[in-house]
Swiss-Prot record:
Name of the protein this chain belongs to: dCTP deaminase
Pathway annotation from the record: Pyrimidine metabolism; dUMP biosynthesis; dUMP from dCTP (dUTP route): step 1/2
Active site: 133 (proton donor/acceptor)
CDD domains assigned to the protein according to its UniProt record, in alphabetical order: trimeric_dUTPase (cd07557)
Entry keywords, A to Z: Hydrolase, Nucleotide metabolism, Nucleotide-binding
Biological process, per Gene Ontology: dUMP biosynthetic process; dUTP biosynthetic process
Family designation: Belongs to the dCTP deaminase family.
Source organism: Anaplasma marginale (strain Florida)
Length: 185
């Protein structure tokens, strides 16, 4: 497997719609950077956030997820409480080629403030908006800026195509249009 360079990412985005909307350069003036980088793509976070709130003393069960465990906020600046967790989605829609798997890493600017951004791999053949998981490990509130960079996606090309891709197994998170809560089917 090899990490794919900027020119490969740009070609796939423009010719095959791998990333849409696609920013073909690194935008960084006065914002948390986003767009194309040397060996990845820095994606933006949308303005709709779901912040965990223990208002009902619920237990989080991934098989029976309590929908009322979140407070929904739509804002350009979301203030994450200390030691909290929230979900959001990318501004960009991704279409992953069948010979590629994508991993996500956080941005150093947020990491230095105590924010960890986590995403499970984007499987070959998957498409949709990516649900982002934010953890505030800091003992203080931290601002998260909508429409600015939140994480970097690294595209790893396999030596050959996989036998069964995510779209072929009707994956439960295929074509998700917004923040998607856990699904156990």
């Amino acid at each position: 497997m090899s990490a794919m360079p900027d020119h490969w990412i740009k070609e796939k985005a423009l010719k095959e719609g791998m990333i849409s909307p696609f920013v073909d350069h690194k935008e960084e003036a006065g914002v948390l950077s986003y767009g194309l980088s040397s060996y990845g793509y820095d994606a933006r976070v949308d303005s709709k956030f779901k912040i965990f709130a223990n208002t009902h003393s619920s237990i989080v069960d991934p098989k029976n997820f309590p929908q009322d465990s979140f407070i929904d906020k739509e804002t350009d600046v979301c203030i994450m409480p200390p030691n909290s967790f929230m979900l959001a989605k990318t501004v960009e829609y991704f279409r992953i080629p069948k010979d590629v798997i994508v991993i996500c890493v956080g941005k150093s600017t947020y990491a230095r403030c105590g924010i960890v951004v986590s995403v499970t791999p984007l499987e070959p053949g998957w498409e949709g908006y990516v649900t982002l998981e934010f953890s505030n490990t800091a003992p203080l509130p931290v601002k998260v800026y909508a429409f600015e960079g939140a994480c970097q996606f690294i595209f790893l090309a396999g030596n050959e195509r996989c036998s069964i891709s995510y779209d072929q197994v009707n994956g439960k998170y295929m074509r998700q249009g917004g923040v998607t809560l856990p699904i156990v089917s």
